[in-house]
Amino acid sequence: MNKSRIDKQNEVYNFIKLQIKEKGYPPSVREICKAVGLSSTSSVHFHLKRLEKEGLIKRDSSKTRAIEIVDPTSKKEVINVPIVGTITAGNPILAIENIEDVFPLPIDYVKNTKDLFMLKVSGESMIEAGILNGDLAIIEKTDSANNGDIVVALIDNEATLKRFFKESSYIRLQPENKSMKPIILENCKVLGRLVGIYRKY
């Protein structure tokens, strides 16, 4: 395909994306014609076929305006990461050890794809670290941590997400929220270290 056709195909694709984002539904073939300056509907159909062949859109020929943008992450290789209950980023709750679900995480989202699990964050104690209520915390299994790491710690069979500091005679689990006080312990069990956050907008 020559450059002018590729440019026009990109125009068609970008217009479809914009229309769906702004109006919530795809444009008609005639609307695409007008928007990108094509003289005939057959030219639009040509570009739509190319976009579909390249896996960028899906169409239902039996319906009008039935154009769907394909999620680019669906074409990427993914790993199924177990979602293990809900963790509290505030007041600790009982740790839930059963796997509630699995999450298809794009493989390029994390460096290490082994020994990962995810926990749903509940609460606001880590908001100043950019960890919000409802986020999925991506955790690498480990029983050790360096000062400053954000960890999942088990305290009396309860799990919490905090920043880890080993002081001279105690362990400090520090929330990232100025209105909350640190948890001071003689010892605690580290279940894993935060390696990423997944958030849906």
Curated annotation (Swiss-Prot):
<feature type="site" description="Cleavage; by autolysis">
    <location>
        <begin position="89"/>
        <end position="90"/>
    </location>
</feature>
<dbReference type="GO" id="GO:0006508">
    <property type="term" value="P:proteolysis"/>
</dbReference>
<keyword id="KW-0234">DNA repair</keyword>
<dbReference type="InterPro" id="IPR050077">
    <property type="entry name" value="LexA_repressor"/>
</dbReference>
<keyword id="KW-0068">Autocatalytic cleavage</keyword>
<comment type="function">
    <text>Represses a number of genes involved in the response to DNA damage (SOS response), including recA and lexA. In the presence of single-stranded DNA, RecA interacts with LexA causing an autocatalytic cleavage which disrupts the DNA-binding part of LexA, leading to derepression of the SOS regulon and eventually DNA repair.</text>
</comment>
<dbReference type="GO" id="GO:0032993">
    <property type="term" value="C:protein-DNA complex"/>
</dbReference>
<dbReference type="GO" id="GO:0009432">
    <property type="term" value="P:SOS response"/>
</dbReference>
<dbReference type="InterPro" id="IPR036390">
    <property type="entry name" value="WH_DNA-bd_sf"/>
</dbReference>
<feature type="DNA-binding region" description="H-T-H motif">
    <location>
        <begin position="29"/>
        <end position="49"/>
    </location>
</feature>
<keyword id="KW-0742">SOS response</keyword>
<dbReference type="InterPro" id="IPR036388">
    <property type="entry name" value="WH-like_DNA-bd_sf"/>
</dbReference>
<feature type="active site" description="For autocatalytic cleavage activity">
    <location>
        <position position="162"/>
    </location>
</feature>
<dbReference type="InterPro" id="IPR006200">
    <property type="entry name" value="LexA"/>
</dbReference>
<feature type="active site" description="For autocatalytic cleavage activity">
    <location>
        <position position="125"/>
    </location>
</feature>
<keyword id="KW-0678">Repressor</keyword>
<dbReference type="InterPro" id="IPR015927">
    <property type="entry name" value="Peptidase_S24_S26A/B/C"/>
</dbReference>
<dbReference type="InterPro" id="IPR006199">
    <property type="entry name" value="LexA_DNA-bd_dom"/>
</dbReference>
<keyword id="KW-0238">DNA-binding</keyword>
<dbReference type="Pfam" id="PF01726">
    <property type="entry name" value="LexA_DNA_bind"/>
</dbReference>
<keyword id="KW-0227">DNA damage</keyword>
<comment type="similarity">
    <text>Belongs to the peptidase S24 family.</text>
</comment>
<dbReference type="Pfam" id="PF00717">
    <property type="entry name" value="Peptidase_S24"/>
</dbReference>
<dbReference type="GO" id="GO:0001217">
    <property type="term" value="F:DNA-binding transcription repressor activity"/>
</dbReference>
<dbReference type="GO" id="GO:0045892">
    <property type="term" value="P:negative regulation of DNA-templated transcription"/>
</dbReference>
<dbReference type="GO" id="GO:0006281">
    <property type="term" value="P:DNA repair"/>
</dbReference>
<dbReference type="InterPro" id="IPR006197">
    <property type="entry name" value="Peptidase_S24_LexA"/>
</dbReference>
<comment type="subunit">
    <text>Homodimer.</text>
</comment>
<keyword id="KW-0804">Transcription</keyword>
<dbReference type="GO" id="GO:0043565">
    <property type="term" value="F:sequence-specific DNA binding"/>
</dbReference>
<dbReference type="GO" id="GO:0006260">
    <property type="term" value="P:DNA replication"/>
</dbReference>
<keyword id="KW-0805">Transcription regulation</keyword>
<keyword id="KW-0235">DNA replication</keyword>
<dbReference type="InterPro" id="IPR036286">
    <property type="entry name" value="LexA/Signal_pep-like_sf"/>
</dbReference>
<dbReference type="InterPro" id="IPR011991">
    <property type="entry name" value="ArsR-like_HTH"/>
</dbReference>
<protein>
    <recommendedName>
        <fullName>LexA repressor</fullName>
        <ecNumber>3.4.21.88</ecNumber>
    </recommendedName>
</protein>
<dbReference type="InterPro" id="IPR039418">
    <property type="entry name" value="LexA-like"/>
</dbReference>
<keyword id="KW-0378">Hydrolase</keyword>
<dbReference type="GO" id="GO:0004252">
    <property type="term" value="F:serine-type endopeptidase activity"/>
</dbReference>
